[in-house]
Amino acid sequence: MQAPPYWSGYNWTSIQWISAFLNTELSATDRSLTEILVENDGSLPGSSFSAPTIDSEISKHYTQIRSFLDGEDTEQIFGAAYDDAQWVVLEWIEAIKFMNEYDAYTNGSRSLDDVRKFAHRAHVFYNLVQNQFDTSTCGGGITWNPALEPYKNAITNELFMASSIAMYLYFPGDYNTDPYPTANYSSDTNTTLPSLPFMQPHDPLFLDNAIKEYDWFKSQNFTNEQGLIVDGFHVSKGQTACDERNEMVYSYNQGVILSGLRGLWEATADPSYLADGYDLIATVIDATGWNTQDASKASEWAGLGRNGIMEDYCDAAANCSQDAQIFKGIYFHHLDIFCEPLPTETPLVQGVTVLADGDMAATHSEHCESYAAWVTHNAEAAISNRDQYNVIGGWWGEKQNNKNNDDGSQSATLDMAVPLSPGSWDVVNDPSILDHEPWTCERSCRQEAVGGPSSDNGSGSDATSIPHTELQKRDGRPSHTVDTQGSGVGVLRAASDFTRRMLEKTV
C-alpha cells in the first residue's frame, strides 16, 4: 500500500471510517511483527527476515500510525453514524495493544504521551455511543443513525460489543475531561458538549455493556436459515418491537462479532463465547462453498461466495461502494484476532486476561488450524487479482469465475451476479434506498447514514453534499483502490499469522 507505483497509479483517498480501519491494520501488522520477534528471536521460520528488518518495518508503520492521530478528520466522523465512531475506538485501542506488546518485548517505553493521546481519542468516541443502548424499542440495542427512522443493524451493535470489551481489556484509563474531537469543534459547530467523565482502566461498565449487548443481539435472531448474520431490523410505525428484518448479508457482519466474542472469553472465561464463534466461522466457511465436494456445485453461489472464496453480492455485479470494498478485509482481521492463541501463562502485560487450561487452549488451536487452509486459499485468490500496480482488486474470485480475464482488470460479470434474497435492502451499495420507507430520513442524512465523503475525492467544492457511493461512480473509481488493497492486506495478514502459528508448533 505504501509503494510509489501504487500512489502514482491512484490518487483517491479513503472515507474516514475506512481510514480508521486502515490505520487499525497498521497497528495490527506491527503486533504481528512484534510476535515474530518475541517467539522466534527475530527470525521468521522459512523466511529471510531478520530482527533489524522487522524492527525497521515496525518503526515505519508506527511513524504513520502516530502521524494519523493528528491527520484524522475527527470532526467529520464525530458527526456521522454510531457505527463510524466505534471504528475510531477500535483503531486506537489496537494501537495501544501494539505499544503494550512491543514495550514488553523491548523492556522499554514508547512515548507515554502517545498512549495518553490514543486513550483519549478512544474515550471521546466511545462516549458518543456508551449511553445509546435503548430499551424503548426492540428491548435494547443501538440505532444505526439518529437521522433515520429506527434501524437497529448488526454492524453498529457488533461494534458496540467489540469496542466495549476492547475498552475493558486494554484501555489504560483517561482523566482528560475535554469532550471535543478537535480544538475548533465548538466554534465550527456552535455546539457545547458536557465534560467527559473520568474513566478508569478495566471499568466494569465496559464489561457490562459488552455482555448486555451480546445477550440482546442473540435474543433478536440476527441469523438467517443458513446461519449467516443479516443486516438489521426496522421498527414499524407505532411499534416498539424489531418487526421487519432486512435479510441483506454482508461479509463484515460475520466478522466484527468474532473479536468481541474472543474478548468476552478473556474477560469472563465463559467457553460459550468461543463456542458461538466456532459455529459462526464454520457457517461462513460453508457459505463460500469450501466444503462442497462436487467441483461444479462448488462454483455455485453458496450464500457468501463460491469456490471457497469469500464474496459479497456486489463483487460480480461490480457495483460495490467504497464501504463494501473493505468488507472482506474486515472479516479476516477480526477472524485473526479471534484465533490468536489462548493465554496459558501470565501475559507479559498485566491486565484482566484469564488463563486457559491446556485442553481449552488445544481445542482452540485445533479449531483455528482447521481454518488455515481456507484463509490461505482466500489470500491466494486475492493476490491473484492484482493489476499492473500490484493493487488487489475487489472481487477475489474473478479469475476462477471469469476465464476471459487475464489482465487483472475487473468489470461486471452479470451472468455471475446473484440476485438478492427476498426481503433484502442493499443500502450500502444503493443509498437511494434511504429516500424511501422504511428508511425515510428525518433530516438530510444520505451522506451521514452511509458513511460520509472521502477526505480528498477530486470532485470539487460541492463534494461534501454527495454521498460517497455516488462519488465512487462519478469520479470513475476503479475496482482496484486503496479500499480494495486494504481489504487484501486484511486477508494476507491473517494468512501470514495462521501459517506462522502452525509453523511455530512444528519448530
Positions of predicted regions on the chain:
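Extended, leucine-rich alpha-helical cores of fungal transcription factors
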Residues: Y10-W17, G79, D83, V88, ...
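Fungal eukaryote-biased detector of long internal structured cores
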Residues: E75, Q86, L90-Q220, V235, ...
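Extracytoplasmic, non-cytosolic globular domains
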Residues: L159, S163-M167, D203-K218, F222, ...
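CBM-like carbohydrate-recognition segments
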Residues: M1-G71, I77-D83, Q132, K152, ...
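Catalytic cores of eukaryotic secretory-pathway lumenal/extracellular enzymes that build
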Residues: F222-S236
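Short coil/turn linking the two alpha-helices of tandem helical-hairpin repeats
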Residues: D30, T34, I93-D103, Y168-Y175, ...
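Membrane-interfacial loop- and helix-cap regions that link adjacent transmembrane helices
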Residues: F233-G238, R245-N246, Y252, L304-G305
